[in-house]
Amino acid sequence: TIEENNLDWCYSLRQIYDKDGNYVCNDDCESLGKWQSYHGINHIDTNCYCLKTEVAIKLAQVWHGGWGQDRVFLSAMSQYFSKFDCTGEYTVNYKVDGNPGSVNAEFFHNGNKIMNEKYNGVFPWRKI
């Protein structure tokens, strides 16, 4: 996606799995990048990024902070490197319920239901 479209960076979508490794659903509600999540923010999960080396080096310091830096990083990336896109494919496997503070399958089922109603089942981030 980066090379084909002359982008600075891109991101992939997520498939959600439970703690036992069973497929739950696609993430059509949270890590959507250009499109707001069902709770009204733009978000890309840390493991969904693909960056050109020079971009990663220039913004590496943005990761320093703590919980929530993925949101800060997305803001900086969008501001300073605006040539980006979503691959439109669900190529990242994300496991839920890993610890007591983790989101669970219900989070994605509920969020996906809200987004399905909002977009009438036609999600603009999908390219498959």
Model-derived regions, located:
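Conserved donor-nucleotide/metal-binding helix-loop-beta segment in metal-dependent transferases, i.e.
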Residues: T1-I16
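A residue-level structural signature of the nucleotidyltransferase/glycosyltransferase Rossmann-like core
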Residues: W9, C48, G66, K83-F84, ...
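Active-site donor/metal-binding and catalytic loop motifs
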Residues: Q15-N22, N47, T87-K118
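A recurrent flexible, glycine/aromatic-enriched loop bordering the glycosyltransferase active site
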Residues: C29-Y49
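Conserved beta strand-loop-helix elements of the APE1-like EEP
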Residues: Y49-A56
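Acceptor-substrate binding/catalytic loop of class I
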Residues: L59-G65
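Acidic donor-binding loop at a coil-to-helix junction in glycosyltransferase catalytic cores
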Residues: G65-F73
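Catalytic donor-sugar/metal-binding loop of nucleotide-sugar-dependent glycosyltransferases
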Residues: S75-N93
